[in-house]
Amino acid sequence: MTLDEAIAKDQELKSKFLTAIAAQVKLDAAAIAKVDVCDLGKWLYGEGERKYKFLKSYKPCADAHATFHQQAGKVVREINGREFADAEAMLADNTAYSKAFGALDAAVKTLKKDAKL
């Protein structure tokens, strides 16, 4: 799996959240908030860490990934608390969630460039 494919999977969380909101179903907040469960996290804390932790762009990327999953966990807590309107509002543009994803996307691009991937 490429880094582009891995970050696309994290981007798909928004659709998953919107589907859960529409269906009014609960999600696994603990799993979504974990940084080492998704494909990008597995790469960052596996092969990526082994090969690229010396790059100055590695830690900011890992930090941005952690921040994104913190925000995703907050959205899921709202969904699971049946605060569907609040959860949906958290997914809008210029929210902490969307800014965290934007920062993650930029950090991954920088790491890819530095690592020549």
Where in the sequence are the language-model features?
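N-terminal membrane-sensor/transducer module of prokaryotic signaling receptors
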Residues: M1-L117
